[in-house]
Amino acid sequence: MISSKPRLVVPYGLKTLLEGVSRAILKTNPTNITQFAAVYFKELIVFREGNSSLDIKDLIKQFHQMKVEKWAEGVTVEKKECIKEPIKPPPVPCKPTHMEKSTDTEEDNVAGPLFSNKTTQFPSVHAEVQSEETSEGARGPSDKPTTPKTDYTPPSSPPPAPVSAEYAYVPADPAQFAAQMLGNVPSTYSEVLMVDVATSTPAVPQDVLSAEFAEEVVLSAPLVCSGETVEVQVVSKTSAQVVVGPVSEAEPPKASSAPLQGEQEPPAHEAPDTQVTSASRISSIYNDVPVNEGVVYVEEIPGYIVIPFTDHDQVACVKEIEQSPPGSPKAVEPKTKISIESLKTVQVEENSQHKSSVHVEAEATVLLSNTALDGQPEVPAEPLDAEGFFKVASENSLHLETEIVIINPDDPGQEESGGNAAPHSSGDPFPPAPGGLTEPEMQPDGEAAPEQV
C-alpha cells in the first residue's frame, strides 16, 4: 500500500556543509554565532569561485585548512593578548608643556624645599641640612648685608629658629609661641606652663597682721545627757578686720607670704587700734518652745586677744552643764556653755589712749526631741563631729543676739564696768567672763520653759 506522506530528499553536500560550519564554530567559539555563520558562508562563496572544479567535500576540507585554521589561531592569540594586557604597566601620561594664565599663580612657582620652613613643631632632615642657611639669614643684618635672592620667601613668613635634633615643646600661649619662634625665649622656658594650677594652692599662715575675709562654717554635734537627746548645730558667719600698729619702729612689719589674687596690701596705720567684729547666733527649742540659755565670751590675755573665729583650725565645744532630773515636776531648763577656742592670735600694743572693742553676734541651733524624757537611757555624750549627727523630731529654732564690748584693762572705765557686773553664785554653771567682761544680756523669744510630760 502506498503512503500518502511525501518523502523528503536531503540534497547532496548539505550534510557536509552543515558539518563544516559546525566545526568552525566549535573551533573559533565566537561570541555571536549568527554573525560568524554569515561571514563563514561569504568566505566560502568567494573561495568556491576560485576553486569551482572541486567537489563540495574537497572544497569544505581545503576551506577549513586555509581559512578556519587561521581564524582559530587568531582567536587564541587575541585571547592571550587580552590576558597579558592587565599585567603590563599603564603608559605614563605626558606632562603638559604649558599652563593656562588663569590658573598660573605665584604660589605654584615656589620651590618645593621652601615649604619645609613652615614646619615648626617637628624636626626634619631637611631642616637640619638647611639650619646653617637659616641661621645665616637670621643674623645677616648684624654681621653683613646679604644679597637678595630670587627664590627668597615673602616677608610675611619669617625664617624659623634652628631646629634641634630632638622634639621641641610648643607652648599653648600664642605670644610665647611667637617669642620662641623668633628665638627670644628658649624652649625650656615654656615648660613652666605644664604646672597644673588647679591642684597647687598657696598655704596661708596662721598669723596675719592685716586681713579681710568672710567665712561660713557649719558644725553639728549630737549630745545625749540623762535621757535627753540634744542636737546642736552652730552656723556662724564671721567677718573681721584687724589693724595692728607696729610693735617697735625698728622691727619691720610682717606681711602675708601668699596674698590674695588681685588684692593690694593695705597701708599700715600708725594708731594701734584693734577692732574685732564677730557675728554668731544661738537658737534652741524643746517641744516647740525655746528654753536654752547660752553665754558667749571672749577670753582676753594681757597683750593678746583671742579672736573667736570658727574655721577648720578651730574647735567649737558645746557642753551640757545643768539639767533637771527626768522625774522632777520643774520645767526643764538646760543651760549650754559655748566655748570657742581659736589658734589665731594678734599681738596688740598696750596703749591707754586707745580702746579695743569687740562686737560678737553668735548664732547656734539646739534641737531637742519631742519624745518624753521618762524611760530614756542615759548615754555618755559623744565628741563633736562636723560631718554626722543624729536627727530629731523637731527643728524649730530660737535666735539670740548678744553684743560684747571689751575695754582695755588700763582704761579706768574698765574697772567701773567690771564692778557693775552681777556676781555669780557658787552653783552657777557659767564662770565669770575673764578680763572683767560683763555677761551678755540674753533675749530669747519665749522665756517660759515647757514642763515635762
UniProtKB/Swiss-Prot annotation:
InterPro entries: CABYR (IPR038848), cAMP_dep_PK_reg_su_I/II_a/b (IPR003117), DD_CABYR_SP17 (IPR047579). Interacts with FSCB. It is found in: Cytoplasm; Cytoplasm, Cytoskeleton; Cell projection, Cilium, Flagellum. It comes from Mus musculus. Disulfide bonds: none annotated. This is Calcium-binding tyrosine phosphorylation-regulated protein. CDD domains: DD_CABYR_SP17. Residues 12-49 form the RIIa domain. May function as a regulator of both motility- and head-associated functions such as capacitation and the acrosome reaction. May bind calcium in vitro. Keywords: Calcium, Cell projection, Cilium, Cytoplasm, Cytoskeleton, Flagellum, Metal-binding, Phosphoprotein. Residues 86-165, 246-278, 406-453 are annotated as: Disordered. The keyword Transport does not apply. One of its GO terms (molecular function) is protein domain specific binding. Phosphorylated on tyrosine residues during in vitro capacitation. Dephosphorylation affects its ability to bind calcium. GO terms for cellular component: cytoplasm; cytoskeleton; cytosol; motile cilium; nucleoplasm; sperm end piece; sperm fibrous sheath; sperm principal piece. Residues 143-154 have a biased composition (Low complexity). Expressed in spermatozoa. The gene is Cabyr. Pfam families: RIIa. One of its GO terms (biological process) is sperm capacitation. It comes from the Eukaryota.
